[in-house]
């Protein structure tokens, strides 16, 4: 069994996608469909986590992180399905300074994706859903 290191929590009230979110770490914001919304928050979480994992993989390989300055951009898209349901899709775009000098870039990206906790969550490997009465 995995050892839990810590937990962060956030609570949504009001209109859901057009409501309010308050949580640990100073999160206290209104959500809007065209502004800060769940997709934007997911993209920010994944980009930050993935870039950290990528830099760790680079260091483990002896790659100079400062020289290559990785930039990870997470894109989270909101889809309407043919059956009327909703779905999210996501992809990561990574750029490096001096990329032509890097070896096995795809291997680095794959290692970071395998290590990144948010990537694991997106794959559904570690999602637990519990419904509790109020």
Predicted regions, residues:
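Extended beta-strand/beta-hairpin segments
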Residues: 1-44, 51-134
């Amino acid at each position: 069994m995995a050892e839990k290191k810590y937990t962060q929590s956030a609570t949504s009230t009001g209109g859901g996608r057009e409501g309010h979110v308050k949580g640990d770490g100073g999160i206290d914001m209104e959500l809007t469909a065209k502004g800060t919304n769940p997709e934007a928050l997911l993209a920010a979480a994944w980009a930050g986590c993935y870039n950290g994992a990528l830099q760790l993989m680079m260091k483990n390989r002896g790659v100079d992180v400062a020289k290559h300055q990785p930039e990870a951009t997470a894109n989270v898209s909101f889809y309407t399905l043919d059956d009327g349901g909703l779905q999210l899709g996501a992809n990561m775009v990574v750029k490096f300074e001096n990329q032509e000098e890097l070896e096995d870039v795809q291997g680095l990206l794959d290692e970071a994706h395998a290590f990144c906790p948010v990537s694991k969550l997106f794959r559904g490997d570690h999602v637990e859903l519990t419904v509790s009465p109020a």
